[in-house]
């Protein structure tokens, strides 16, 4: 829409930004708010109309901020079972390793809030899928700590703070492409991935049509 992508988006500054998630952990707090709204609306109108999960992606820096403590504590207290937070657990901050500034056990911290908390290999698709299935069955909010390597595949910047918030550079991009055996052009989606995405789009169109049909009277009501 004509703007550079904001790394720390603020509501009201540019078109297309619906909410402030610029300050680290603000997005997590927003997610808690969304999950509260879902629970209230689900109770008021029933699961046929409102019944969805809220997903959050958070990093090490997000969970260091005080706001994440307050919001996560509230989520545990309220038992927001439809809140699932993916924690990009790469042990790197913009200043260097997270060990420079934090030494707490994040999994145990979230368990103390009353959360379901687990750790997985964030590069393993099966582990991610199984963790989501498990989280959906739990009666508490879930933190999925995904152990990852920042700058994955970069020969000289993998697991280093130099790949945090900064471009790899043309030469390193070339080396990373070679290392990952990635031959697609910039911003080109491989055909097999595009085909999979389109299958989900078709599935969701069917689900949308069923939802509208089941709730036609409610969603056309003057109440809304």
PLM region descriptions:
Residues 1-13:
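Acidic-glycine-rich active-site phosphate/pyrophosphate-binding loop
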Residues 2-5, 104, 191, 205:
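Generic detection of intrinsically disordered/low-complexity segments and helix-coil linkers/edges
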Residues 181-224:
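N-terminal leader/propeptide and maturation segments of large enzyme subunits in energy/redox metabolism
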Residues 13-199:
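Glycine-rich ThDP/TPP pyrophosphate-binding loop and its adjacent helix/strand module
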């Amino acid at each position: 829409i004509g703007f550079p992508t904001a790394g720390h988006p603020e509501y009201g500054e540019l078109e297309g930004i619906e909410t402030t998630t610029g300050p680290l952990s603000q997005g997590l707090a927003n997610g808690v708010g969304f999950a509260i709204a879902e629970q209230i609306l689900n109770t008021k109108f029933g699961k046929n109309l409102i019944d969805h999960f809220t997903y959050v992606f958070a990093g090490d820096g997000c969970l260091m901020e005080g706001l994440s403590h307050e919001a996560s504590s509230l989520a545990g207290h309220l038992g927001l079972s439809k809140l699932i937070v993916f924690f990009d657990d790469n042990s790197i901050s913009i200043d260097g390793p997270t060990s420079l500034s934090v030494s707490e056990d994040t999994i145990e911290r979230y368990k103390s809030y009353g959360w379901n908390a687990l750790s997985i290999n964030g590069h393993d698709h099966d582990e991610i899928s199984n963790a989501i299935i498990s989280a959906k069955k739990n009666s508490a909010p879930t933190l999925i700590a995904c152990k990852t390597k920042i700058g994955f595949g970069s020969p000289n910047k993998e697991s280093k703070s130099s790949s945090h918030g900064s471009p790899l550079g043309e030469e390193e991009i070339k080396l990373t492409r070679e290392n990952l055996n990635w031959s697609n052009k910039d911003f080109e989606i491989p055909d097999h991935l595009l085909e999979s995405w389109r299958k989900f789009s078709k599935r969701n169109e069917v689900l949308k049509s069923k939802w509208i049909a089941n709730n036609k009277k409610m969603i056309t009501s003057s109440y809304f």
